[in-house]
């Protein structure tokens, strides 16, 4: 069975479009927060925010890291202490705040 050229072209173009529509997250690091939208690798399923506060002074702004991640890590699996909080989400640019 021969498929028409226009049909094959439509399939190829739709595959290309799907490749460019992966998860997008903010990827950045800064005190108090940051914002830089970026496309994630295909292995990433979550956008993550990690906030780290100084154990000496809780009045300082936290160091905030935003990134793509495959899965949702928890503090204990990363070996991080009680001064770290992690939030995960699964939609585009959901790790804004």
From Swiss-Prot:
Pfam families named in the record: UPAR_LY6
Please name the PANTHER family in this protein's record: SECRETED LY-6_UPAR DOMAIN-CONTAINING PROTEIN 2, UPAR/LY6 DOMAIN-CONTAINING PROTEIN
The identity of this protein, by name, is Secreted Ly-6/uPAR domain-containing protein 2
Give the tissue specificity: Widely expressed, including in dendritic cells, macrophages, B- and T-lymphocytes.
Tell me where on the tree of life, at the top rank, the source sits. Eukaryota
Q: Which residues form the signal peptide?
A: 1-22
Bridged cysteine pairs (disulfide): 25-47, 28-34, 40-68, 72-88, 89-94
- GO biological process terms, semicolon-separated: acetylcholine receptor signaling pathway; keratinocyte proliferation; regulation of neurotransmitter receptor activity
Q: What does this protein do?
A: Binds and may modulate the functional properties of nicotinic and muscarinic acetylcholine receptors. May regulate keratinocytes proliferation, differentiation and apoptosis. In vitro moderately inhibits ACh-evoked currents of alpha-3:beta-2-containing nAChRs, strongly these of alpha-4:beta-2-containing nAChRs, modulates alpha-7-containing nAChRs, and inhibits nicotine-induced signaling probably implicating alpha-3:beta-4-containing nAChRs. Proposed to act on alpha-3:beta-2 and alpha-7 nAChRs in an orthosteric, and on mAChRs, such as CHRM1 and CHRM3, in an allosteric manner.
Domain named UPAR/Ly6: residues: 24-72
């Amino acid at each position: 069975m021969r498929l028409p050229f226009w049909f094959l072209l439509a399939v190829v173009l739709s595959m290309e479009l799907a490749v460019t529509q992966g998860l997008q997250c903010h990827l950045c690091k800064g005190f108090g927060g940051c914002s830089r939208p970026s496309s994630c690798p295909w292995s990433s399923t979550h956008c993550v925010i990690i906030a780290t506060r100084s154990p000496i002074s809780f009045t300082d702004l936290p160091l905030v890291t935003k990134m793509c991640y495959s899965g949702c890590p928890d503090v204990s699996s990363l070996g991080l202490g009680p001064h770290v909080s992690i939030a995960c989400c699964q939609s585009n640019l959901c790790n804004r705040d």
